[in-house]
From Swiss-Prot:
Pathway: Cofactor biosynthesis; (R)-pantothenate biosynthesis; (R)-pantoate from 3-methyl-2-oxobutanoate: step 1/2
Gene name tied to this protein: panB
Binding residues for Mg(2+): D50, D89, E120
Species of origin: Aliarcobacter butzleri (strain RM4018)
Protein name listed in UniProt: 3-methyl-2-oxobutanoate hydroxymethyltransferase
Cofactor: Mg(2+)
Length: 269
């Protein structure tokens, strides 16, 4: 299947906001220059997610990701995808109050070419988000199932199952929008509730495990390409059996080495 490239035009905050009700946004994670370069002219935005702590570093959750780690990977992504709109997840513990949040976001802006930061939290984080946006930091919000809360909430739990939770999620989205966020990730939320959230605000809602009626979708690249074999969330679609293809290729390489068919005369100096 050939890849049809449209005339590539880098996204910015205005274009992202204007996509509401006009264009479905495609967001994908990346953690290094190689994959970022592959994705940059296809996806609308690249997220350097703290999910790298799991899929890249092999940790059980995202909580031990550090700011230094996120800055390192964001620089790698920006080096590989110089024209992409890049968002960095602010890791757990880096935005516990207004001053700490601003200090760490300024450090991100100084050390990387990231276009925006992403912060988990709703009404409880609205004051912090407002402080950041008032000081020229572009913020993407994140509500619903929030991976940085996994230990305090006892696991990954789908949100929006009760009327009370539905109303809280809508309040969260409205509060984050009023605080100045340009977009919000809504994760692990019942699809009918995610649709109501999308309709309740004027900024794009990017869904992950939140149904088809959001303004766009985000997936972790290793999930989407079938590299993570241990577990497949219900909301993930494998567009490639990446793990099997890689193992087959490496196995063939090993066989070629053992039977001396690699390198060939054509591959020698």
């Amino acid at each position: 299947m050939s890849i049809i490239k449209n005339n590539f035009e880098k996204m910015n905050i205005t274009k992202i906001k204007n996509s509401k009700n006009n264009k479905k946004l495609t967001v994908i994670t990346a953690y290094d220059a190689l994959f970022a370069k592959l994705f940059e002219e296809i996806a609308d935005m690249i997220l350097v997610g703290d999910s790298l702590n799991m899929s890249f570093a092999g940790r059980p959750d995202t909580l031990s990701a550090t700011l230094e780690q996120m800055i390192y990977h964001t620089n790698a992504v920006c080096n590989g995808a110089k024209n992409a709109f890049v968002i960095i997840d602010m890791p757990f513990g880096t935005y516990i109050n207004k001053d700490e949040a601003l200090k760490n976001c300024v450090e991100v802006y100084r050390q990387t070419n990231a276009n925006a930061v992403k912060i988990e939290g709703g009404e409880d984080k609205a004051d912090i988000i407002k402080h950041l946006t008032s000081n020229a930091v572009a913020v993407m919000g994140h509500i619903g199932l929030m991976p940085q809360y996994v230990r305090s909430e006892g696991g990954y739990k789908v949100r929006g199952k009760t009327k009370e939770d539905e109303e809280q999620l809508i309040r969260d989205a409205i509060a984050v929008e009023k605080a100045g966020a340009f977009s919000i990730v809504v994760e692990g939320v019942k699809s009918d509730v995610a649709k109501k959230i999308t309709q309740a605000v004027n900024i794009p809602i990017i869904g992950i495990g939140a149904g088809v009626d959001t303004d766009g979708q985000v997936l972790v690249w290793s999930d989407m390409l079938g590299f993570f074999e241990e577990f497949k969330p219900k909301f993930v679609r494998h567009y490639l059996d990446g793990a099997e293809l890689v193992k087959e290729a490496v196995n063939q390489y090993r066989n070629d080495v053992q039977d001396k068919s690699f390198p060939s005369k054509e591959e020698e100096y």
